Swiss-Prot record:
Gene3D superfamilies: RimP-like superfamily, N-terminal (3.30.300.70). The gene is rimP. GO terms for biological process: ribosomal small subunit assembly; translation. InterPro entries: Ribosome_maturation_RimP, RimP_C, RimP_N, RimP_N_sf. This is Ribosome maturation factor RimP. One of its GO terms (cellular component) is cytosol. Signal peptide: none annotated. Keywords: Cytoplasm, Ribosome biogenesis. It comes from the Bacteria. NCBIfam families: PRK00092.2-2. It comes from Cutibacterium acnes (strain DSM 16379 / KPA171202). The lineage of its organism: Bacteria, Bacillati, Actinomycetota, Actinomycetes, Propionibacteriales.
Length: 178
């Protein structure tokens, strides 16, 4: 069975456990097939599904595939995961779930340019068409940064990827206050 048909089969199953089906891939792996299912959801903290939710979804997906016979008689391996931090943000809900996170944006190039502007910004607000960012101002100094807001149309975004932060700025600010 191809990924498109599996997507139609699995969407209601994933929805029943309160999550969203993000992607389904079927990849040959020797004599077996690898069925990769990527799920998403708000989770208990609003930032993605918990391990318990992923575990519950995995069990339901496995039962559905076995009961429906969708994979036929040939063996397969099921792999269910959340989107992961390096997966580009593509939907308005992805931006909403990453409010407060630092994201590297690459904008679509203007007509006369070969590549678009690339910059980092912390998501402050996210709507269906626009994301509001907190970005470092041009007159900012390395040891005492100054921030300003910037609105970006989602239609203008070529790529947006969450950046891993080992020392978040808001965590440092709260330490300095104490």
């Amino acid at each position: 069975m191809n990924a498109e048909r599996l997507t139609r089969l699995l969407e209601p199953v994933v929805s029943q456990v309160g999550l969203e089906l993000d992607r389904v891939d079927v990849v040959p792996a020797g004599r077996r097939r690898l069925v990769r299912v990527t799920i998403d959801g708000d989770g208990p903290d609003g930032h993605g599904p918990s391990l318990d939710e992923i575990s519950e979804a995995t069990a339901e997906i496995s039962h559905c595939l076995d009961d429906s016979g969708a994979m036929g008689e040939s063996p397969y391996t099921l792999e269910v995961s959340s989107r992961g931090v390096s997966t580009p943000l593509t939907q308005p809900r992805h931006y909403r779930r990453n409010i407060g996170h630092l994201v590297r944006f690459t904008l679509n190039p203007a007509e006369e340019q070969k590549s678009g502007e690339t910059f980092d910004g912390r998501i402050a607000e996210a709507g269906e068409e626009v994301v509001t960012l907190e970005v470092e101002a041009e007159n900012s100094k390395p040891h005492k940064p100054v921030y300003t807001t910037r609105e970006v149309q989602l239609a203008d975004v070529a790529k947006a990827v969450v950046q891993v932060e080992l020392n978040r700025r808001d965590a440092q600010a709260s330490k300095e206050e104490n």
